[in-house]
Amino acid sequence: MPLSYQHFRKLLLLDDEAGPLEEELPRLADEGLNRRVAEDLNLGNLNVSIPWTHKVGNFTGLYSSTVPVFNPEWQTPSFPNIHLQEDIINRCQQYVGPLTVNEKRRLKLIMPARFYPNLTKYLPLDKGIKPYYPEHAVNHYFKTRHYLHTLWKAGILYKRETTRSASFCGSPYSWEQELQHGRLVFQTSTRHGDESFCSQSSGILSRSPVGPCIRSQLKQSRLGLQPQQGSLARGKSGRSGSIWARVHSTTRRSFGVEPSGSGHIDNSASSASSCLYQSAVRKTAYSHLSTSKRQSSSGHAVELHNIPPSCARSQSEGPISSCWWLQFRNSEPCSDYCLTHIVNLLEDWGPCTEHGEHNIRIPRTPARVTGGVFLVDKNPHNTTESRLVVDFSQFSRGSTHVSWPKFAVPNLQSLTNLLSSNLSWLSLDVSAAFYHIPLHPAAMPHLLVGSSGLPRYVARLSSTSRNINYQHGTMQDLHDSCSRNLYVSLLLLYKTFGRKLHLYSHPIILGFRKIPMGVGLSPFLLAQFTSAICSVVRRAFPHCLAFSYMDDVVLGAKSVQHLESLFTSITNFLLSLGIHLNPHKTKRWGYSLNFMGYVIGSWGTLPQEHIVLKIKQCFRKLPVNRPIDWKVCQRIVGLLGFAAPFTQCGYPALMPLYACIQSKQAFTFSPTYKAFLCKQYLHLYPVARQRSGLCQVFADATPTGWGLAIGQSGMRGTFVAPLPIHTAELLAACFARSRSGAKLIGTDNSVVLSRKYTSFPWLLGCAANWILRGTSFVYVPSALNPADDPSRGRLGLYRPLLHLPFRPTTGRASLYAVSPSVPSHLPVRVHFASPLHVAWRPP
């Protein structure tokens, strides 16, 4: 007869009428019993012949993609003009006095952030905007292009002007070396960037103050150039022998963006401004050839080139426009749905390209992208606005992947110890937090996004169209892209974007000037940045508890009035550093703070309501006696694991699920196991904060016996059969807790100290978790442990009772941490063992 739920509860000692613990508990460590229960609950039967279930409620397999929905009404969010102050360290020091080594190190990391991948793969421009919504291809193209344009206008992106120069909007930083009319403007090293002087020679760089910029130019392998890149890949980048080839290649490419990807387009006609400016640029380029023979001090000729003047004059002045869009003006309409009708709606379509307020030199950047972009809903609650998704997953994949730095995340107990108090709370919303952190221009060649222009995009999507060849084609080739769909889409978009349609139909390549979200480095940098800022705030306002995780910043104070005045001063301080807050999204929580998915109050911590609801829904949909795909089990365990610390049996209760995921087998829920989990998650117990105190109860064990020292008295007992030492120590700790009721127990076993009971026999782990809930452990060396003698059967000998103080841990998120001294020789990348990584290791 299968094991009933009631019987199973009794077995786990979850009911009160169980026999004496010293007899009952060691039975749960018995392997035979564990095996029989597993068979009864159908936990060990992993090989099933019935087909697997691949969907449980909203949970599908980890890799099955949920199809995003395109919303034609999406609004592009507006971005404030975010400019983090370059002298942020000085400003903080004026405010709070000298910073600690830790704070300085963290702030230097992001001023500016640097990114050097091992290898960068370049993709053709066609892959710039992902064809995520085939039904709405044109609409998605323009909305994405508009989003990119908005980011560029907000100073978040660079626009590639030539192979070696880029333009941007907003205030420049000192490491962004400005070019003016093809000359380099050096900014003095005083990091304020107020004074600047022009270098004498015509655009020759004698020695760049920005090391990595040149370094990444000279390391050809870093750019991973492919041979088919034509003139770009000719000549090693930075050898003085190939100046002639390089001046040719750079002048030929110094206008806008040429999609040199798949050979459809002849370069000379691809950019609107090229015909007008080509001859002028040739002259200037050859005239400076004589100077560019001079060597720079590093022994490499490094040349810069003239940037074409602004393309603002109307294109109609030129002879015959090379612009795809404007060519329709001079052609006969091919049908009722010809694009000529749309192009003739306006007399002045504006410039073909726009240039930023500042031009800077950049390392050699090919006319390619390194990641695709597409739009999705901003978040599940806000479907009116869009969010740009950037796919830079190439840096996390394959043998050349970048190993991102690890960083500490406060675990649940540390978080509770820190934040569970009777303070009033509010949380600040940092708007576009990632886009606060500036990136060094040397990273630009690795983080490129863009688009190949509308004609190429449309041609790629319609399989019928022939290769477009602008220059030698007849007018008919121009009309190859005309279609009813395109015509209708463009007419609708014309209402939204007006003359911008022309600008957006041109190819463009953009590099990130601030850190993008799609790179594993970004969360690390953001965490360093906000934690350093909170650390400064805590010192500046000693009565305020400021804490952050990523872009979630919370402030706590004794009273609501105090909190409001702190809020005003701290907001002003953050604004003075250039940090943008969203005042409408400031949330006042009263005494129970919502943070990181938890509700934290003076009583302790519980999961937020929406997570509890999700768990209830999950159990409602969970099928019994049907094998469930292990990928779906991963999603279920992810949800249940988050709330596991609040249940009686904790993580150990989920061990059978972990085991099936590890062996990549389907898992079948038996009615009893499902009922057990269901009841576990129906009643959640808060995790309370640990209190400091003196330890007076000690436990110790040998494989054959256990001993306790409670105050001045001792106790001992023996096991029926010898047990593994860790199991024996865990049993001793359970006996100590149940005999004395003490919440503070001294032990010399590291596994018991860690409070992770997932590696013990399953039934014992579940029972011990419930018995030891809310217990804190203090480490006592074996030699000093008063329970050592009783455990060896010697009760008469008393060691002096230790007074071991216990201090609650706040993990690495300590508020008053003295910064550790930095070793003289740092390894290439520092790895912090994150508590999150450690806590989630399956057995």
UniProtKB/Swiss-Prot annotation:
Site annotation Priming of reverse-transcription by covalently linking the first nucleotide of the (-)DNA: residues: Y63
Activation/inhibition comment: Activated by host HSP70 and HSP40 in vitro to be able to bind the epsilon loop of the pgRNA. Because deletion of the RNase H region renders the protein partly chaperone-independent, the chaperones may be needed indirectly to relieve occlusion of the RNA-binding site by this domain. Inhibited by several reverse-transcriptase inhibitors: Lamivudine, Adefovir and Entecavir.
Keyword Nucleotide-binding among UniProt keywords: no
Further comment found in the protein's record: Hepadnaviral virions contain probably just one P protein molecule per particle.
UniProt function note: Multifunctional enzyme that converts the viral RNA genome into dsDNA in viral cytoplasmic capsids. This enzyme displays a DNA polymerase activity that can copy either DNA or RNA templates, and a ribonuclease H (RNase H) activity that cleaves the RNA strand of RNA-DNA heteroduplexes in a partially processive 3'- to 5'-endonucleasic mode. Neo-synthesized pregenomic RNA (pgRNA) are encapsidated together with the P protein, and reverse-transcribed inside the nucleocapsid.
UniProt-listed GO biological process terms: DNA replication; symbiont-mediated suppression of host innate immune response
Residues annotated to bind Mg(2+): D429, D551, D552
Keyword ATP-binding: no
Sequence similarity: Belongs to the hepadnaviridae P protein family.
Protein name: Protein P
Xref: InterPro entries: DNA/RNA_pol_sf, DNApol_viral_C, DNApol_viral_N, HBV_DPOL, Rev_trsase/Diguanyl_cyclase, RT_dom, Viral_Replic_Matur_Polypro
Spans annotated as Terminal protein domain (TP): 1-177
Region (Polymerase/reverse transcriptase domain (RT)): 347-690
UniProt keywords, alphabetically: DNA replication, DNA-binding, DNA-directed DNA polymerase, Endonuclease, Host-virus interaction, Hydrolase, Inhibition of host innate immune response by virus, Inhibition of host RLR pathway by virus, Magnesium, Metal-binding, Multifunctional enzyme, Nuclease, Nucleotidyltransferase, RNA-directed DNA polymerase, Transferase, Viral immunoevasion
EC nos: 2.7.7.7, 2.7.7.49, 3.1.26.4
A GO molecular-function annotation: RNA-directed DNA polymerase activity
Domain Reverse transcriptase positions: 357-600
HAMAP family: HBV_DPOL (MF_04073)
